[in-house]
Design a protein with these regions (language model features):
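Bacterial Sec-dependent N-terminal signal peptides
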Residues: 1-40, 736
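C-terminal outer-membrane/trafficking sorting elements
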Residues: 1-4, 17, 664-670, 674-742
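Beta-propeller-forming repeat regions
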Residues: 36-663, 673
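N-terminal compositionally biased, intrinsically disordered segments and leader/signal-like regions
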Residues: 3-6, 26, 499, 617, ...
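Intrinsically disordered/low-complexity terminal segments and short unstructured peptides
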Residues: 24-25, 605, 635, 703, ...
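Generic cytosolic/nucleocytoplasmic N-terminal low-complexity/intrinsically disordered segments
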Residues: 3-6, 12, 25, 422, ...
């Protein structure tokens, strides 16, 4: 905000008073509003797993990665641009001294139209890769227009129109099923790009669209396509792994051709004979098949198929898609594979923790030989619990800092667990170490889609572990909590699970929070239609009973862009008021300021993430199904936002304006004196532990952890009137405040 008197004076000199008011109202007010919520993606927090520090732990996870190399920063080195189909999001990694470094700021440089699939190929032979992607009417193409010293830029190849090809007699759209990935390569070896795609309808054959640019102009600067055959290679796919070579599926005895589901194609010269061989995969198959070209570059003939590579075949639950890019910096294209799926497919699910397979090229460029290297390329250097990560924080070891917990959707046996990371750093410089991938043995509950959070549900002054999950047997979602069985830290035992009578949809999200500040935990429910419902706890301190109070809390009713919103509440801008954070299906974060202001209109802040490359604030997808939690990780007056997502990773959004807290803590304790029938409210400005004593030093409670800037309420029905002491332990130092019960 404009608080410097010199700045105010300068503006007054430039504008007469009416114009100044207009300028401030129209132009500066939005900046003032949004500047209160300004964040950067932070990657500074170290994370240790099995004794090793992860290279980029906060990169967000990967599921269905489509891998391409491209020069992102103009240093003439190939970087990585990955489109994740499940997240509908691009991930960018820079090549820094032959090591990959996650750099999310480059993701904003790609066209917003990218969807379903993305292939980067040099269309016009200028040494810069151009972009091909899915279009509702076929294929969209964007030309790389980047100039030296400038950011990556693009222009549409044919603005407003998809890629065309000459059919039987005239130009038509080159149609590609949205689940398919075509092969875009120089099939005939003449120097320009041709396209292979599965026939859009009918038999399972491949169309060959030959580019006549070189033949007509002698230049490879355009896509002058003509469909020369609808049966490239002379074969049909009949079913998973079954092909009819030189005949139809009916002639083979395989019955009617099965063309449902997606297909992926990738061409390369596997045997160094000067023509293009084919890698083929399809949605219902676990393998990638090699079909060697026994013909020529001008007339392909496929006669057999085999799983590929021969030694250690690509084998995923469903729909592996292959890619060829040099990712180990030796100048030779390596083989990579990742499932080309949106998400899980019921119980037949891919292992999304290990879903990017790398086969290093130990041969040559001309005669490649692919040797299996790892099944978690990039994933092994980031937090990636598989899919649908849900973060939560609490001080489980009572050492004064916040430890991290991550709910995962399911293991390969379709049982969900919670990951536990101990904070081995400090309150202002966190560092996390993986302790277990099955905290509290929650796998024994035989549930999946576990979403953890911490709240005192039984009014004993200790945080309990609250779980939303689905039952493996019947698929129903439920709400329950594990009661904390220790006064020092946290101890959760499965025999102390309490089910809560509350109906929740399988994809809906619950936030436990004291909405009406009566000392009881209430519920905000993010529903499947995008509405946010407020359910008041109308029970007593030791008996929970939720009743619906508002079907459109804060006026947030049904919205197709906000389906299944995930929610968090915290004072984000240090103004003493709670704000609402919403993560939505698209992966976007929206903040509503001061939710208890009773304002008839609430302003949504969405352009909250700073891009240091573009020097702008913008809305940014953090992967679909964003799951936010606000927590003070850096010991500042403004908490960070940690976001989980569909790809199983995490992002840390650090508040740019957060100021380091002063050396002396500030703890609000009220009312003081305290009427004996009331509750004592405590709000510390940083993470604190509180314990109560009589004036004679007798202990009257066990220690309780209070997160920064959150109000905790304490009742003392059994204490007599008199003076008592609240002793606080903050960052290893103790302080005390007196209060009176009268």
């Amino acid at each position: 905000m404009i608080s410097n008197p010199v700045k105010r004076y300068c503006l007054a000199k430039l504008f007469p008073v009416p114009r100044l008011f207009f300028f401030l109202t129209i132009f500066l007010l939005p900046w003032v509003l949004f500047a209160q919520f300004t964040y950067q993606i932070d990657q500074s927090i170290p994370v240790e797993v099995n004794g090793n520090l992860l290279a980029f732990p906060w990169a967000g996870g990967l599921n269905s990665a489509q891998l391409n190399t491209v020069d992102l920063n103009g240093d003439n080195k190939p970087d990585l641009a990955i489109y994740d189909r499940g997240a509908a999001k691009i991930f960018t990694f820079l090549n820094q001294n032959n090591k990959w470094q996650y750099r999310p700021e480059y993701e904003a440089l790609f066209p917003a139209e990218v969807g379903q699939w993305m292939l980067l190929r040099d269309l016009n032979c200028d040494g810069k890769k151009d972009l091909f992607t899915s279009d509702p009417f076929g294929i969209s193409v964007f030309i790389n227009t980047t100039k030296p010293g400038e950011n990556l830029s693009w222009r549409p190849y044919n603005p407003g129109f998809p890629l065309l090809t000459k059919g039987f007699s005239s130009n038509i759209n080159l149609k590609v099923n949205e689940s398919d990935i075509p092969a875009i390569d120089d099939i005939d070896g003449d120097g320009d790009l041709d396209i292979l795609n599965l026939k859009f309808v009918g038999t399972g054959t491949i169309e060959y669209h030959k580019n006549l640019s070189m033949e007509r102009t002698g230049r490879c600067d355009s896509m002058q396509l003509e469909r020369v055959t609808q049966n490239f290679g002379g074969f049909e796919e009949c079913s998973c792994g079954k092909f009819a070579f030189g005949k139809t599926c009916a002639q083979l005895g395989g019955g009617r051709t099965e063309h449902t589901g997606g297909k992926t194609l990738l061409t390369f010269d596997n045997d160094n004979d000067g023509d293009r061989d084919l890698l083929y995969s399809e949605e219902s198959c676990a393998f990638v098949y090699l079909l060697e070209n026994k013909g020529t570059k001008d007339l392909a003939v496929m006669l057999s198929s085999s799983v590929f590579p021969t030694s250690t075949p690509i084998a995923m639950s469903i729909f592996p898609a292959p890619y060829l890019e040099d990712v180990d910096f030796d100048g030779k294209a390596d083989l990579l594979a990742s499932p080309n799926v949106y998400a899980r497919a019921n119980l037949n699910n891919n292992n999304f923790q290990n879903s990017v397979w790398l086969y290093s090229n130990t041969g040559t460029t001309q005669s490649p030989k692919f040797s299996f290297s790892k099944n978690n390329f990039l994933q092994g250097e980031m937090i990636d619990v598989g899919d649908y990560s849900v973060p939560a924080f609490a001080d489980y070891d009572a050492d004064g800092d916040l430890d991290m917990f991550i709910g995962r959707y399911a293991r390969q046996d379709f049982i969900g667990t919670v990951y536990q990371y101990e904070n081995i750093g400090s309150p202002s410089a966190p560092a996390f170490k993986l302790i277990t991938n099955d905290y509290a043995n929650l796998s024994q509950l035989r549930s999946f889609n576990i979403k953890p959070q911490f709240a005192d549900m039984d009014a004993d002054g200790r945080v309990d572990l609250v779980l939303t999950s689905k039952n493996l047997k019947n698929g129903r979602a439920s709400l329950s909590f594990l009661s904390n069985r220790t006064n020092q830290g946290m101890l959760f035992l499965l025999e102390f699970v309490t089910s809560i009578a509350f109906n929740v949809g399988g994809t809906e999200n619950i936030l436990i929070n004291d909405i009406n500040l009566d000392g009881l935990p209430d519920i905000l429910l993010g529903t499947s239609d995008g509405a946010i419902e407020y359910w008041k706890n109308s029970g007593a301190a030791d008996s929970i009973n939720f009743t619906l109070q508002n079907k459109s809390y804060l006026g947030l009713g049904a919205s197709t862009s906000r389906q299944n919103p995930a929610l968090a509440i915290a004072d984000l801008n240090a103004d003493g008021n709670d704000d609402l954070i919403i993560g939505d299906q698209r992966g976007l974060i929206t903040i509503y300021k001061n939710i208890r202001s009773n304002s008839p209109t609430l302003i949504a802040s969405t352009d909250i993430l700073y891009n240091p490359l573009l020097k702008t604030y913008a809305t940014k997808s953090l992967g679909s199904k964003a799951q936010p939690v606000a927590i003070n990780l850096f010991n500042t007056d403004k908490p960070a936002i940690i976001v989980g997502n569909s790809t199983g990773g995490l992002y840390v959004l650090k508040n740019e304006e957060g100021k380091e807290l002063p050396p002396d803590p500030v703890v609000l304790i009220y009312p003081n004196p305290l009427p004996s029938a009331d509750e004592l409210s405590i709000k510390p400005d940083r993470n604190a532990q509180v314990q109560f004593f009589s004036i004679l030093g007798q202990k009257v409670s066990e220690p309780t952890f209070i997160p920064a800037n959150q109000i905790f309420k304490f009742a003392f029905p059994k204490l007599s009137r008199g003076i008592y002491i609240a002793r606080f332990t903050i960052n290893g130092k103790s302080s005390a405040q007196k209060f009176i019960i009268n």
